[in-house]
Structures are given as C-alpha cells and as structure tokens.
Amino acid sequence: MLQTTSLSAMRIFEAAARLGSFRAAAEELNLSPSAVSHAIMRLERDLGVALFERTTRSVSLTVAGQTLLNHASNAFEELRRGVEQISSNKAQLLRLHCAPSFAAQVLSPRLPQFLKENPGIEVRVAASTNYARFVDGLFDADIVYGEPLNREDLIVIPLSEEIVLPLCAPDLAHQIKSPRDLFHQPLIRSDLKRIQWIDWFEANDLGPPPSPSMSFDRSFLAVDAAVNGLGIALESDVLARRELESGKLVRPLHRICRDNRYIGHYLAYPKSGSQRRLARAFADWLTRECQPASTGSE
C-alpha cells in the first residue's frame, strides 16, 4: 500500500489537513484547488479510506485522516531536519522558546558560554509570554514563567528558587532604613509578576501598599527603571542577578525584612523526539547556570 502512495500526494494531504482547507493548501503549494482535490481523492482511493468529510462549504478530517495527519506531520518534520542537517555546515540546531524577561536578563548573557562549551551548535531563540506548541515541531525546548499546566508528554525541570525583594539604585538606598520607608518611595510594578507589592507588604505586616508610581508589562523593563533611579522595583534576584553583581542595584532591606520565595521559571521539552538529547544537554547546562550566586551588594 505504501509503495503506491506518492510523497507529493502525502504532502498535499498534510497541507490540506493542517490548514483545514483545500483552497489554502493550493495557495501554499502553488497548485489549483482542483489539483489538490483530485490528489486527495486519489490518495483516499489508494488507501481505501476516507480522509476528509466534505460539505459544500468546508472539509474536516475523519478519524483516519487525523491519525494520518499526526504521522505525516512528524514524518515531514523529520525529513526537514534531515535536509537541514546535511545541507548545513552546522552540526545541530537548537530552537528555544523563552519567557521574555528570562531571555533578556538570564539566557542571552549566558548563551556565549553555552556556545563556547558546545561548538557546532546553532541556537535560535523566540520570546513571548505564551507556551511553546511542541506539537507543531517549531521548538525543541521552552523556558516558561510559571509551571506548565499540560505536562503529560513533557519533561519539566524547575529552575532555581527566586527571591522576590525590593531592589533599587545605590543612591536611593540611603533613604531606606526600614520596610515602612517604602510608603514614602516611588514603587515600580511588574504587571505580570506572580508576587506583587500587596503580597510583600502583607508578608511584612505593613497593610496595603501605596499605588505604584509606574508599571511595566515586562520584568526586565522594571529592572531597568530601577537601575535608572526611577524607584523601588519588587523583582526577582534571578532576573536582576547581573545588576546586583555589578552594583547597579542593591537590596536596601536585606536581612531586615521578609521576602517572598518561589520557583518562577521552568524548562520543558518533549519526552520523545530527535532533539531530546540536545534539549537534555541544554537543560543540564542551564540548571547549572541558574544555581544561586552570592552578591556583594546589599
């Protein structure tokens, strides 16, 4: 049966099934809609099973069609990887998806060391607040903010514990001697942070906090605002590690207040797949890199 099924027919089927439209598949493959329709009918005849349910306005996959799509998608992805590997001088390609602030503050500064330790690997990074869809075959690993909910087919590794605490520029720190001094300082809010100022004030028995003087939708922007002396940021010591180590930021209430701790970021990658070994090597390296480091700035 497989010998009578052409690769081109399978490619047409995969495009139509993935896009949910014969016309869209025709546009993608630069074919006419009738050519797509006839190719799929021939494929159904050769296989002896209906792959699509057709109405006057739409098509949808049958159970058999969905099963074939799952296998066809994996097969074409593996074929693409093989062509990419033999047509490139680079040995391997690692495609990462990452939470934006972690990408900017943690991953990007450390990638040169990873590439130095792993010559012949090319790394591509895409950043967004969404989770990577591994089923599409677009990414090999994902660094996410917050524990992944759908982890049945994933290996999920918690990265280091993060301490969320007030951070500010050294010049501003001289005005802060106790937690109550924060009532009189401009507070910087990170909109997507799971731990907010209200949580920190409550942990320190201070009551409701004053309204923030500014807010940002990314932690790396809040960190940068604090570096520039715009106020006090409630941020992760992991995301602000470079700034703490360089002295651009300090912890004005270190050891005299209660801070919030949690696992903020996780690394996830599929349990199976041709890139599993490379993803595992990256996970091992990143886990080592995220180990806590002491800072001299307080």
Swiss-Prot record:
GO biological process: DNA-templated transcription
Domain (HTH lysR-type): residue spans on this chain: 5-62
UniProt cross-references to Pfam families, sorted A to Z: HTH_1, LysR_substrate
GO MF: DNA-binding transcription factor activity; sequence-specific DNA binding
Chain coiled-coil ranges: none
Gene3D superfamilies: Periplasmic binding protein-like II, Winged helix-like DNA-binding domain superfamily/Winged helix DNA-binding domain
DNA-binding region: 22-42
Keywords, comma-separated and alphabetical: DNA-binding, Plasmid, Transcription, Transcription regulation
Domain of life: Bacteria
Homology family: Belongs to the LysR transcriptional regulatory family.
Official protein name in the record: Uncharacterized HTH-type transcriptional regulator y4mQ
Protein source organism: Sinorhizobium fredii (strain NBRC 101917 / NGR234)
